[in-house]
Curated annotation (Swiss-Prot):
The modification Phosphothreonine is found at residues 151, 154, 169, 214, 229, 232. Residues 179-222 are annotated as: Induces experimental autoimmune encephalomyelitis (EAE) 1. It comes from Homo sapiens (Human). The modification Citrulline is found at residues 159, 165, 167, 199, 231, 256, 264, 293, 296, 303-304. Residues 51-65, 117-130 have a biased composition (Polar residues). This is Myelin basic protein. The classic group of MBP isoforms (isoform 4-isoform 14) are with PLP the most abundant protein components of the myelin membrane in the CNS. They have a role in both its formation and stabilization. The smaller isoforms might have an important role in remyelination of denuded axons in multiple sclerosis. The non-classic group of MBP isoforms (isoform 1-isoform 3/Golli-MBPs) may preferentially have a role in the early developing brain long before myelination, maybe as components of transcriptional complexes, and may also be involved in signaling pathways in T-cells and neural cells. It comes from the Eukaryota. Residues 1-146, 180-249 are annotated as: Disordered. The modification Omega-N-methylarginine is found at residues 177, 183, 241. It is found in: Myelin membrane. Belongs to the myelin basic protein family. MBP isoforms are found in both the central and the peripheral nervous system, whereas Golli-MBP isoforms are expressed in fetal thymus, spleen and spinal cord, as well as in cell lines derived from the immune system.
């Protein structure tokens, strides 16, 4: 126990001596920092920053390891002197050009960056006022009118969706006319059978969830639905019947080629009234049982 107590006292004495030496070293470091600040008054940007931050570790190393350099504080700062322009010219160029609160003597020939920006704004002030109006109307995310001038092209308009919006409306109008308006033309024009008025009334009275394609659905949805399915039948336009009929009558085309619209309309009606006809309408009833009630996934074209 006595040995342990003696060791503890020795450790305490060592700690006190170490703290005293550390205090002396810290005072020396402060003196070094003050001397470096006084010697680097001609360069205020580097003086305080390098004395505190950049060269702090190097001064600590020299103060602890080498006693000769700590005795002479000038030698301790000769390796990386903050006011020496020859040792670090890139930092002098970086800090002394547009440093706040400094009058620049190094780059008198070249104007500063802020002056260049101001001259550019003054030169383009007359033209950028009208462009700012255009840019605020057409491109609200754009900040400068000059950039709008540089990128004013059809691709730029297409990126922001102005030209294709008008073009796509024409395309979609034609698609909507093909899907919606022209669908009724062959039904009215072909008076081949007695199922004709019943079928048109049946189309109107159907609930929109019950068949695979709603009558008043968005033509954009039809357009993309028919593009995604690989076997869209474009010759159905030339055959003289609407796309809705070719959509619902594809299952019976190969089996009963001789029938006209009446047979297919009766198939269509019976398939929706509870799937009663099982003898010749088996394929259609199966298809509409599988996916006829979902207008997106139950398109018969996708199952062909």
């Amino acid at each position: 126990m006595g040995n342990h107590a003696g060791k503890r006292e020795l450790n305490a004495e060592k700690a006190s001596t170490n703290s005293e030496t550390n205090r002396g070293e810290s005072e020396k470091k402060r003196n070094l920092g003050e001397l470096s600040r006084t010697t680097s008054e001609d360069n205020e940007v580097f003086g305080e920053a390098d004395a505190n931050q950049n060269n702090g570790t190097s001064s600590q190393d020299t103060a602890v390891t080498d006693s000769k350099r700590t005795a002479d504080p000038k030698n301790a700062w000769q390796d990386a002197h903050p006011a020496d322009p020859g040792s670090r010219p890139h930092l002098i160029r970086l800090f002394s050009r547009d440093a706040p609160g400094r009058e620049d003597n190094t780059f008198k020939d070249r104007p500063s960056e802020s002056d260049e920006l101001q001259t550019i704004q003054e030169d383009s002030a007359a033209t950028s006022e009208s462009l700012d109006v255009m840019a605020s109307q057409k491109r609200p995310s754009q900040r400068h009118g000059s950039k709008y001038l540089a990128t004013a092209s059809t691709m730029d308009h297409a990126r922001h969706g102005f030209l294709p919006r008008h073009r796509d409306t024409g395309i979609l109008d034609s698609i909507g006319r093909f899907f919606g308006g022209d669908r009724g033309a062959p039904k009215r024009g072909s008076g081949k059978d007695s199922h004709h008025p019943a079928r048109t009334a049946h189309y109107g009275s159907l609930p929109q969830k019950s068949h695979g394609r709603t009558q008043d659905e968005n033509p954009v949805v039809h357009f993309f639905k028919n593009i995604v399915t690989p076997r869209t039948p474009p010759p159905s336009q030339g055959k003289g019947r609407g796309l809705s009929l070719s959509r619902f009558s594809w299952g019976a085309e190969g089996q009963r080629p001789g029938f006209g619209y009446g047979g297919r309309a009766s198939d269509y009606k019976s398939a929706h009234k509870g799937f009663k006809g099982v003898d010749a309408q088996g394929t259609l009833s199966k298809i509409f049982k599988l996916g006829g009630r979902d207008s997106r996934s139950g398109s018969p074209m996708a199952r062909r």
